[in-house]
Amino acid sequence: MPQCFTIMNNDNNHNTIQEFDVNLICDFFLNTNRQGPGSPEATLKALSFINNLTVQSLIADLGCGTGGQTMVLAQHTPGSITGLDFFPEFIECFNRNAEKLNLQDRVKGVVGSMDALSFEKESLDLIWSEGAIYNIGFERGLNEWRNYLRSEEH
């Protein structure tokens, strides 16, 4: 059965309700390297501003999709990476991609929602969300997710 969402818009006195099958999104993006804008070069440029990651570092990639940027991160950082995405089909592909690159020992994908994280507070060394934070709003994401980062004393 298709998973459907109802979107309600209320702008300028025009109320609309639209239903769409989110499986269309999965089908469209499943076989692409990335589910949004970006490139390996853009990922590496952003990563160049991050210091002090170690083999003990815990990294989360929120809204990871099939893991295009996550695999680039894994190939250029130590530590463990958990990719989180709402779509199970993306996570299945994510885990296959990690296995193909022999990264499965430190890179795993899990199904979840970026607005209800299952990580413990102050447990992560880095939160990555390349082109996905807009799903819950940039300001909201920054405000909520910072609680999951380790304090600077750790």
Say what each PLM segment does:
Residues 2-27:
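N-terminal, positively charged/glycine-rich alpha-helical extensions of SAM-dependent methyltransferases
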Residues 25-38:
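Class I SAM-dependent methyltransferase Rossmann-like catalytic core
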Residues 36-55:
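Conserved alpha-helix/loop element of class I SAM-dependent methyltransferases that forms part
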Residues 60-62, 66-116:
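Class I SAM-dependent methyltransferase SAM/SAH-binding core
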Residues 115-126:
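A short acidic, Gly/Pro-enriched loop at the edge of an enzyme's catalytic core
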Residues 129:
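A short beta-strand submotif of the Rossmann-like class I SAM-dependent methyltransferase core
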Residues 135-145:
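A short, conserved alpha-helix within the catalytic core of class I
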Residues 153-154:
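Conserved small/polar residues in nucleotide/adenosyl-binding loops
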